[in-house]
């Protein structure tokens, strides 16, 4: 017979009740903690997530400002396109989606690979563009099937179009797709939010330099959407603010005329108003069409441009680096006069060669018979090398560096473009730093005629000439005429006070300008037969930049050497002489081709500006 131990059973039951109660308490504790965590600690997070399901903030892109020439001619257009975009978090099977969309919107393998690449660097909650520039047929096909594709939308956007193509590419630049580097830069500046609705950003030229002004301010719409992502109603609308319109100093008709003269050449021309630095024309040949860059140029096409031996991507006006040659002789003369090295009455005998004192090193003059007795005026008129060898020897490299840097050589000009090279005005310190060698007197002699280590851009040559025209007032070139926002027009204002070289009242300024006039108008001047008939008066200075050095007993013959080893030819000029309205620099790389020569082109440009009815038939060869 079995007896029950009621006390033991009661204790066991109580233990089980206590354990069960403890488990219930723990479960309720966990539940209460989670409720607290969800309702209190993460209230803001889940409220936001909940609102995102039905309340959306849609950024609205601003209209990009238009760029005009000085006469009000629009140089760019804004055109409306449509893209198709996918919001990743709404898509369960991305591969299946892409397969379904391919026949509807004609997706190419490149479209899909670009999209997958963009997915990796994008938030899954933000739409990612699948394809740009949809056709009307593609839009219609998708509209019929749209209800099948939750998370896929078609959006309109504006793109840039450049109707003048290659003619203005180096000035206007272009806009192109915003890439990761752009986003990082925008984020660093606190501007990323302002590009939430944009595809493109300025990458080159005026489009890049004035990006902040042209872009405008992004607006937004607060909308309520259903569970399919369709807009139910508009809750709030903050319209975007359009970008500013920009008027350039450029004259489109002059630009086109100069380009017609340089067709087929590797060349550059800059035309500037010497009174305020306004750029009237900036031509660099050859050029490129900026339109393919807007939607994204192919690697193959970009590679062709990048490796083209004629360098179409380079703006030769601001990035072309050349020994400035004899175009610097007026500024060398001016510097020597200001430093007291020479006077207007100083004379040297211009022999066929000049010998460096204490050596047997001979430096040749371009004129085999020499020039006879020379003062500074005649030396500039005849571009006498031997005179400037002597001047450079007497000045020394330190004074040359100090004076010529004031004319703007060896540093940026201040032009409102990012694409500019500094050039190089050599100095004793530079050679030691770069070449680890001492400076020799022979180096100085070559610098005296704009050769040797010295390299400059055409825009630097014009800046120096503008300083000469303005009695030493150094004026920065610029492309901006004014900015327009609604009815408000803000004209260009230079930053800071222009630098002044020496005394503006010095008579030497006029003396050197007169010598440049003599170069073009005196019978002994090297440009006489090209320019002396101009009724408005031209002052000029030519230059020939060596591509390779000749041996002491070697004679230069352009017809006997390859084209790309021939000398570069420069012309700088200002006109009308008594009241200059333009300062111009022209370069023909390797002396031009197909019978094109520098002096006649310069004369044609000036006649086009000041004597359009003139007969510009000129001699075939430059002196």
From Swiss-Prot:
Which UniProt keywords are given for this protein, alphabetically ordered? Answer: Carboxypeptidase, Cell inner membrane, Cell membrane, Cell shape, Cell wall biogenesis/degradation, Hydrolase, Membrane, Peptidoglycan synthesis, Protease, Transmembrane, Transmembrane helix
Which EC numbers characterise this protein's activity in its record? 3.4.16.4
Per the record, membrane topology reads: Single-pass membrane protein
What's any GO biological process attached to this entry?
A: cell wall organization
Q: Which cysteines are joined by disulfide bonds?
A: none
Q: Which PANTHER family does this UniProt record tie to the protein?
A: PEPTIDOGLYCAN D,D-TRANSPEPTIDASE, PEPTIDOGLYCAN D,D-TRANSPEPTIDASE MRDA
Protein's name according to its UniProt entry: Peptidoglycan D,D-transpeptidase MrdA
User: Which species is listed as the source?
Assistant: Salmonella typhimurium (strain LT2 / SGSC1412 / ATCC 700720)
């Amino acid at each position: 017979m079995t007896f029950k131990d009621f006390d033991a059973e009661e204790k066991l039951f109580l233990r089980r009740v206590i354990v069960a109660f403890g488990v219930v308490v723990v479960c309720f504790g966990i539940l209460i903690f989670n409720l607290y965590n969800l309702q209190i600690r993460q209230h803001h997070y889940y409220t936001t997530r909940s609102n995102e399901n039905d309340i959306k903030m849609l950024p609205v892109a601003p209209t990009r400002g238009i760029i005009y020439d000085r006469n009000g001619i629009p140089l760019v257009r804004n055109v409306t396109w449509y893209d198709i975009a996918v919001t990743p978090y709404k898509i369960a099977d991305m591969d299946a989606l892409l397969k379904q969309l391919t026949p509807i919107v004609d997706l190419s393998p490149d479209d899909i690979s670009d999209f997958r690449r963009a997915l990796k660097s994008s938030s899954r909650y933000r739409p990612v563009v699948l394809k740009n520039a949809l056709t009307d047929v593609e839009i219609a096909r998708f509209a019929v099937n749209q209800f099948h594709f939750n998370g896929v939308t078609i959006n309109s956007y504006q793109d840039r179009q450049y109707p003048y193509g290659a003619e203005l590419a180096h000035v206007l630049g272009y806009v192109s797709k915003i890439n990761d580097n752009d986003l990082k830069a925008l984020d660093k500046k606190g501007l990323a939010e302002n590009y939430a609705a944009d595809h493109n950003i300025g990458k080159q030229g005026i489009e890049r330099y004035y990006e902040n002004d042209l872009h405008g301010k992004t607006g937004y719409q607060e909308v309520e959407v259903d569970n399919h992502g369709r807009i139910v109603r508009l809750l709030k609308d903050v319209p975007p603010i359009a970008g500013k319109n920009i008027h350039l100093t450029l004259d489109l008709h002059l630009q086109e005329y100069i380009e017609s003269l340089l067709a087929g050449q590797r060349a550059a021309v800059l035309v500037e108003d010497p009174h305020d630095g306004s750029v009237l024309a900036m031509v660099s040949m050859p050029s490129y069409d900026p339109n393919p860059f807007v939607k994204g140029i192919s690697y193959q096409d970009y590679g062709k441009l990048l490796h083209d031996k004629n360098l179409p991507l380079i703006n030769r006006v601001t990035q072309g680096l050349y020994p400035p040659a004899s175009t610097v002789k007026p500024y060398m003369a001016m510097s020597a006069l200001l430093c007291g090295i020479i006077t207007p009455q100083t004379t040297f005998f211009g022999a066929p060669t000049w010998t460096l004192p204490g050596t047997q090193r001979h430096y040749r003059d371009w004129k085999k018979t020499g020039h006879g007795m020379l003062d500074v005026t005649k030396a500039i008129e005849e571009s006498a090398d031997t005179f400037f060898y002597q001047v450079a020897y007497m000045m020394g490299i330190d004074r040359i560096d100090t004076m010529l840097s004031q004319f703007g050589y060896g540093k940026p000009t201040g032009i409102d473009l990012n694409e500019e090279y500094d050039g190089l005005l050599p100095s004793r310190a530079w050679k030691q730093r770069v070449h680890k060698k001492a400076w020799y007197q022979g180096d100085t002699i070559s610098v005296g005629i704009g050769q040797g280590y010295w390299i400059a851009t055409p825009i630097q040559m014009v800046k120096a000439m503008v300083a000469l025209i303005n009695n030493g007032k150094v004026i920065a070139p610029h492309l901006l005429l004014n900015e327009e926002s609604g009815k408000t027009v803000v004209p260009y204002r230079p930053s800071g006070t222009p630098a002044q070289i020496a005394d503006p009242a010095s008579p030497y300024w006029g003396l050197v300008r007169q010598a440049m006039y003599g170069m073009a108008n005196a019978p002994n001047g090297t440009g006489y037969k090209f320019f002396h008939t101009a009724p408005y008066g031209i002052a000029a200075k030519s230059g020939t930049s060596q591509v390779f050095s000749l041996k002491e007993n070697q004679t230069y013959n352009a017809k006997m050497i390859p084209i790309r080893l021939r000398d570069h030819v420069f012309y700088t000029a200002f006109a009308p002489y008594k009241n200059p309205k333009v300062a111009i620099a022209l370069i023909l790389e390797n002396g031009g081709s197909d019978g094109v020569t520098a002096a006649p082109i310069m004369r044609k440009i000036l006649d086009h500006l000041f004597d359009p009815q003139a007969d510009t038939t000129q001699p075939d060869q430059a002196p």
